[in-house]
């Protein structure tokens, strides 16, 4: 999906670009009968970045292609956003997957402790789009120019580093910065 829909969406966009550049066909729905691999990144229908749910995938397996492999990428949890339903939902959705990819070891351990299946799983850290995030034109801060701060987080969720942003904001009141 185009637009600022978070890390999972950017992961999907970057993966799609990489696969297509390497002559692989990528589809964003479950209409084709010969899909080799389904990647579940957001199984919650209520999310705007969700293309399909784990139930849609189960139906695809049952009625269209029983040989498709399913990978579930997990990058969300209750502890991160102080919710109460996400972990249970993702653990249930994960039962559809053949393989699980976690975005961090911490997240993997959290879900293993909470009872997610111990099937094939790996931690794969997210990478950045090198056309955007690179050191072209980089120069060391000379402490005379204004300090420029860039964050990869966006949104109004207080659990995404607000305490750090608040400390930075207080530092900016100091004439040194």
Predicted regions and their residues:
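Proline-centered loop/turn at the N-terminus of a beta-strand
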Residues: 67-69, 99, 120, 176
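Extended catalytic core of nucleotide-activated donor transferases of GT-like folds
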Residues: 23, 27-96, 106
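Nucleotide-activated donor-dependent transferases that construct or modify glycoconjugates
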Residues: 1-4, 41-44, 151
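Hydrophobic residues at beta-strand termini and immediately following loops
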Residues: 124
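A short, active-site helix/loop in glycosyltransferases that binds the activated sugar's phosphate group
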Residues: 95-120, 128-132
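Acidic anion/phosphate-binding donor-loop and adjacent secondary structure
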Residues: 82-84, 112, 127-146, 160
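Conserved donor-binding/catalytic core segment of Leloir-type glycosyltransferases
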Residues: 140-160, 166-170
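N-terminal subdomain of nucleotide-sugar transferases
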Residues: 1-30
């Amino acid at each position: 999906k185009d637009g600022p829909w978070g890390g999972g969406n950017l992961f999907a966009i970057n993966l799609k670009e990489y696969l297509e550049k390497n002559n692989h066909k990528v589809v964003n729905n479950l209409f084709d009968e010969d899909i080799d691999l389904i990647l579940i990144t957001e199984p919650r229908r209520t999310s705007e970045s969700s293309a399909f749910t784990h139930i849609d995938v189960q139906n695809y397996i049952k009625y269209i292609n029983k040989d498709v492999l399913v990978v579930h990428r997990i990058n969300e949890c209750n502890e991160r956003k102080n919710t109460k339903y996400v972990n249970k939902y993702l653990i249930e959705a994960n039962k559809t997957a053949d393989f699980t990819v976690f975005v961090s070891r911490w997240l993997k351990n959290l879900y293993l402790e909470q009872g997610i299946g111990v099937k094939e799983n790996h931690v794969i850290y997210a990478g950045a789009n090198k056309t955007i995030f690179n050191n072209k034109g980089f120069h060391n801060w000379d402490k005379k120019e204004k300090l420029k701060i860039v964050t990869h987080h966006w949104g109004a969720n207080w659990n995404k580093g607000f305490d750090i942003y608040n400390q930075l904001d207080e530092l900016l009141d100091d004439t040194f910065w």
